[in-house]
């Protein structure tokens, strides 16, 4: 890790409701192997030697988080999440900016990506240490891509050669990301991930190829796939 990265903190926006899962609770609180997805995700981040702290943004009326064992961990800090992802990330960044120890870089990671590999985090840190903007984990698009018309029929085939699936973590300098998110929200810009805020300001974040196993649990069938990946890792240990 480059010397300029004196402090690396992970930010986990976890205030979403995950309605597409059609479950009785937000998807981050569904269980795999006796632990919630959120616990798997945060423990994966905090076990990386470069990450000193995790700040998790949770809804103020969340009834689940306080019952988790990680809620009492000294290196896991809860802050109030917002209505949108960008609001939650900005809340965590504002908290960090008020601390006596400066946070140079942040890794923003989806609460529902419990399978991120340490080797991918290593690659992201290595690439961003020499990049002026920062970057994201991503995977190249492999399927043939079609653009639909208003009637949900194929309009044309899209060239996939320059297309990537954006993953997380996404890693940026804390001050730069704070300014970008604040400005974008003030202007009413739709922010779907942290990189899009930097793109809006004209920056060019790096793409760092990651593992396809770094899935986001969004649909019911994703839960079984995440369980498979985590079981495979457990068997290898």
Curated annotation (Swiss-Prot):
UniProt cross-references to Gene3D superfamilies, sorted A to Z: Spore Coat Polysaccharide Biosynthesis Protein SpsA, Chain A
Q: The organism sits in which domain of life? A: Bacteria
User: Which GO molecular function annotations are given, in alphabetical order?
Assistant: 2-C-methyl-D-erythritol 4-phosphate cytidylyltransferase activity
The reply to whether Glycoprotein figures as a keyword in the UniProt entry is no
Provide this UniProt record's keywords sorted from A to Z.
Isoprene biosynthesis, Nucleotidyltransferase, Transferase
**InterPro entries linked:** IspD, IspD/TarI, IspD/TarI_cytidylyltransf_bact, ISPD_synthase_CS, Nucleotide-diphossugar_trans
The reactions it catalyses are: 2-C-methyl-D-erythritol 4-phosphate + CTP + H(+) = 4-CDP-2-C-methyl-D-erythritol + diphosphate
Q: Does the record carry Transferase as a key word?
A: yes
Q: Which pathway does the record list?
A: Isoprenoid biosynthesis; isopentenyl diphosphate biosynthesis via DXP pathway; isopentenyl diphosphate from 1-deoxy-D-xylulose 5-phosphate: step 2/6
**EC annotation from Swiss-Prot or TrEMBL:** 2.7.7.60
One biological process term in Gene Ontology: isopentenyl diphosphate biosynthetic process, methylerythritol 4-phosphate pathway
Q: Which Pfam families match?
A: IspD
Site (Transition state stabilizer): give the residues: 20, 27
- In this chain, the site described as Positions MEP for the nucleophilic attack is at 160, 216
Similarity comment:
Belongs to the IspD/TarI cytidylyltransferase family. IspD subfamily.
Function (record text)? Catalyzes the formation of 4-diphosphocytidyl-2-C-methyl-D-erythritol from CTP and 2-C-methyl-D-erythritol 4-phosphate (MEP).
The protein depicted here goes by the name 2-C-methyl-D-erythritol 4-phosphate cytidylyltransferase
| Organism field | Vibrio vulnificus (strain YJ016)
